[in-house]
């Protein structure tokens, strides 16, 4: 029922990531972005995973479960993590006592229509696809 901040450092035997292309307005849907994302499979990569574990009840505010990103020490490899193997790692975990959500105050944000059904489907597909 808690949020956790996570940091994992070491040499990853294997790490699989993905990264979307840069997009301009009008922004495509998350499902459209997934069609053109790049998939990366790295081996023996030294670097750091950072991310969060969010409780399932926060789905919609965040992504329930683990949401992790990777960057190699030399800054040439990275992306959203969906799989990794590591033998020796330093793992750091923090349990924040507070959660603050700050919403944009722009006119554009005020006017946007968010379809929750579509949003939940897109997030589920994005987090479960490779």
Feature names for model-found ranges:
Residues 47, 56, 76-77, 88, ...:
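Mature extracellular or lumenal effector domains of secreted proteins
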Residues 1-61:
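Long, positively charged binding patches that form subdomain-scale interaction surfaces
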Residues 4, 47, 66, 79, ...:
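A broad, low-specificity signal marking well-ordered, structured residues that form hydrophobic/aromatic
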Residues 72-114:
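A hydrophobic, small-residue-rich beta->alpha segment in the mid-to-C-terminal subdomain
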Residues 63-71:
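Histidine-centered divalent-metal-coordination microenvironment in nucleic-acid enzymes
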Residues 22-24, 67, 85-86:
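Short, solvent-exposed amphipathic alpha-helical segments in soluble enzyme
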Residues 7-9, 18, 50-53, 69, ...:
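Residues in well-ordered beta-strands of folded domains
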Residues 113, 122-130:
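Mature, function-bearing regions of proteins
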